Structure formats: C-alpha cells, structure tokens
C-alpha cells in the first residue's frame, strides 16, 4: 500500500476497514499510528474490532477477566443454564454440539456477570473496557468451539480442543493510547447514510468472496455477543443448527449482478482517495469484470498471487487459486 500511494508511513492518515472481520487489519493500522474507521455488519466482528482498535488493556479489564476466570474455576457457573447452554450445547435433550455443556455454562455465566457489572458499575466500567472484555469472551469461546472451520455446522463428536475448559484470556495486552477519532461501526456497508458520514485517505475492502453468508456461518458468536436479556427475541431458532431468523444477508454474496451493483455503490459513495480490494479467482465477480467496474472511477491495477484454498474438511482437495489485490486511485479526489 505504501508503494502504491507513495506514503512513507500511515501516521496522520485516516484508514477505512469496511469488512473488518477478525479485526487484525484494523489492529495493524492502529499499531502504525493511523486513525482507523472500521465497520462490519456482523455484531461479533464489530465488537472484536472495537477492542482491537479502541480499547486498552486497563487494570479494570485485567481485574474483571481474572475474576471471571476464578469464578468458573471455583465452579460458580455450574448452576447457570443460559441461552448458549440451552440451544448450542447437548444440554438435556438438545442435540446441538457447538460447545460442550461445561463450556456453554462458562460462556453463559461470564456473559451474565459482565452485564451485571456493566449495569452496577456504570461510572467505573467504560464502553471501551466493556467491549474489551466481551471480545475476550468471544475469542476464548471460539477457541473451544466444536466446528470444522466455521459455525455453519457442528461436528458429530467433540474434537480435542472443544473438550478443553474455556480459559478466559485478554484479547490483547496493548496499553498504548489510540489515535483520536478511531471508531468502529456495525452497519451494512451499503448504507449510504453511513458511507457519507466519514472521510478517509484509504479504504481497505475484504468482502465475502462467494455465496456463503457470514451470518449463517458465524451466528453462535453473534448470539454470545448480544446481551443475554435480548436473546429470547431470537426464538424460535431454525433447523438442526439453530440459526436465528434475523440473519443479515449480504449483497456481496449474491449472484446475478447483485454483487457487482454493491461494488459499484462502494466505489461511487466512499469518500476516499485510495481503495484496496482483496478478492480471488473463485469469487462471484471475475477479475476482468472487477477491473472494468473499477476503471470507471479511476486508475486501476491488480496484483496476483498463487495460493491453495483453505481446507476445512479432510476430504477437500487442495486447489490452486489466485488471490487478487485490486488497487483503485479514485480520480479527482
């Protein structure tokens, strides 16, 4: 990116990360002293990214995380039967195995306790600290999940990592102050009111590549991210896996020109000078078509790299595909 833009560093730059996902890209920009505007339509992702881009590992965070972990080590969670235990573990007659009953109870207990702390310590627990702790719960829960790669299904038998007891660990140990103005959002990126609300020097886009909807593949993490008191509104859940009825459906996962139109909207509405887009040769929009669309808005180039498709199931064969990094320098900005 520095080579393309001619920048020596990201200091004093405002960077947009519009499909923040794991939050790692935003976190790296934070560590390079950039102001970061992050967004993801998935609630769990926006919380994790907030923790990576805005939150510090404070003494308050450390104290609460250690207290929650000690509570479960002292078995204070054993009588907790919350939403995750009831619907996403083999508790009683439920057959879903996203988590063991033990770990589901730990998750439910920690979520209940965190909400109680939030409501009783409103003057001492900041929003940044709350989201730091919640993000830590999310990643610690993910570390003991019983799924092949994503949460679209669970495994019939619990794998080795899933039977380990959940250990609550901080999402990071960064105590360096963030650049003023760094913000994380939880919007559909095509929301034009949202797109008009900020201005950046560069935007990085890592959208869905195929027809698999993220909400349908990560919904248990979204359920953990939501306040326990709101979860009853998610019932009834659908199907063998317990998918909620309100899953967000991204236009970037849809064929028939829908994804192309979505990209057009971003290239037109984003108030930025540079756009970098990650995509690959198996994506919905072809390389040639993407270049045609981008060229309407400015100078365009693409870098290609060979790599093997991620193998989430043993019976999948490794397939050589090309990863693309498109670069668009928008004209007249």
Model-identified regions with their sequence ranges:
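S-adenosyl-L-methionine
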Residues: 1-18, 24-32, 46-48, 55
């Amino acid at each position: 990116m520095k080579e393309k833009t001619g920048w020596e560093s990201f200091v004093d730059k405002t960077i947009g990360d519009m499909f923040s996902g794991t939050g790692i890209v935003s976190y790296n920009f934070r560590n390079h002293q950039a102001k970061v505007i992050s967004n993801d339509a998935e609630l769990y992702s926006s919380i994790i990214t907030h923790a990576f881009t805005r939150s510090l590992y404070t003494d308050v965070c450390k104290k609460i995380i250690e207290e929650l972990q000690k509570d479960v080590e002292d078995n204070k969670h054993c009588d907790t039967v919350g939403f995750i235990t009831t619907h996403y573990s083999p508790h009683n007659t439920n057959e879903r195995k996203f988590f063991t009953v033990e770990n589901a109870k730990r998750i439910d207990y920690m979520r209940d306790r965190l909400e109680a702390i939030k409501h009783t310590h409103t003057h001492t627990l900041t929003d940044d600290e709350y989201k730091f702790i919640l993000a830590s719960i999310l990643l610690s829960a993910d570390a003991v999940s019983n799924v092949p790669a994503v949460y679209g299904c669970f495994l019939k038998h619990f794998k080795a990592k899933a039977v380990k007891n959940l250990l609550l660990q901080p999402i990071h140990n960064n105590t360096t102050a963030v650049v003023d103005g760094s913000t994380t959002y939880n919007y559909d990126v095509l929301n034009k009111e949202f797109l008009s609300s900020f201005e950046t020097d560069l935007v990085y886009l890592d959208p869905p590549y195929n027809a698999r909807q993220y909400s349908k593949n990560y919904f248990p993490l979204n359920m953990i991210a939501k306040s326990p008191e709101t979860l009853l509104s998610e019932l009834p859940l659908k199907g063998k896996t317990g998918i909620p009825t309100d899953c967000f459906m991204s236009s970037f996962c849809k064929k028939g020109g829908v994804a192309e139109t979505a990209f057009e909207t971003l290239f037109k509405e984003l108030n930025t000078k540079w756009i970098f887009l990650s995509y690959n040769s198996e994506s919905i929009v072809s390389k040639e078509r993407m270049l045609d669309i981008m060229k309407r808005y400015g100078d365009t180039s693409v870098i290609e790299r060979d790599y093997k498709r991620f193998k989430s199931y043993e019976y999948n064969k490794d397939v050589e595909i090309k990863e693309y990094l498109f670069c668009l320098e928008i004209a007249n900005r």
